[in-house]
Every structure is written in C-alpha cells, then in structure tokens.
Amino acid sequence: MIQKPILLSSFLFLYIRALLHSIHPYIRTSVHLYTKKITSYNFLGVPFK
C-alpha cells in the first residue's frame, strides 16, 4: 500500500517530463523566431515580417 503512491508519482513525473520534451522544440523554435524578429527589427529599423 505504501509503494503505490510512490509508483504513481514517479509515473506522473515521467509523463510530465515526456510532455515537456515533446513541447520543448516548439517553444525553442518560437523563441528563436521571436528573437530573430527582434534582432532584424533592431538591425533594419523596421519590423521584419
């Protein structure tokens, strides 16, 4: 009975970690595009679209 919550929490942790790993590339690319937009805006003086 004591080991069931531990097993459940570890499974939940692994699930959340896998979810974050699947979401991470999307966040990274969106942040990269956002920073690229900011740098091009600063470089050209006009918003880059």
Curated annotation (Swiss-Prot):
Residues 1-22 form the signal peptide. The keyword Signal applies. Keywords: Signal. One of its GO terms (cellular component) is fungal-type vacuole. This is Uncharacterized protein YLR406C-A. The lineage of its organism: Eukaryota, Fungi, Dikarya, Ascomycota, Saccharomycotina.
